[in-house]
Amino acid sequence: MSSMEGSVLKYPEPTEGSIGASSAKTSWPEVVGMSAEKAKEIILRDKPNAQVEVIPVDAMVHLNFDPNRVFVLVAVARTPTVG
């Protein structure tokens, strides 16, 4: 019988907004309703190596997973005008 038989390995429980045992933040519900610029600022404060992409809410997005990419989806609130 090996010394590992019958042993139970315990791993840290994942925290909210993390993947696996990582403590890296993966979502920012607190920025909902903020301007894209303010949301990007907060995301970069939490995850400085993030590539933050500001895109329209109905835009097509990349299907490949990139752990450093964060999408900030925005909607135009008023009609853009010249002047």
Curated annotation (Swiss-Prot):
Residues 1-24 are annotated as: Disordered. InterPro entries: Prot_inh_pot1, Prot_inh_pot1_sf. One of its GO terms (biological process) is response to wounding. SUPFAM superfamilies: CI-2 family of serine protease inhibitors. The record marks L63, N64 as: Reactive bond for chymotrypsin and subtilisin. Pfam families: potato_inhibit. This is Subtilisin-chymotrypsin inhibitor CI-1A. It comes from Hordeum vulgare (Barley). The lineage of its organism: Eukaryota, Viridiplantae, Streptophyta, Embryophyta, Tracheophyta.
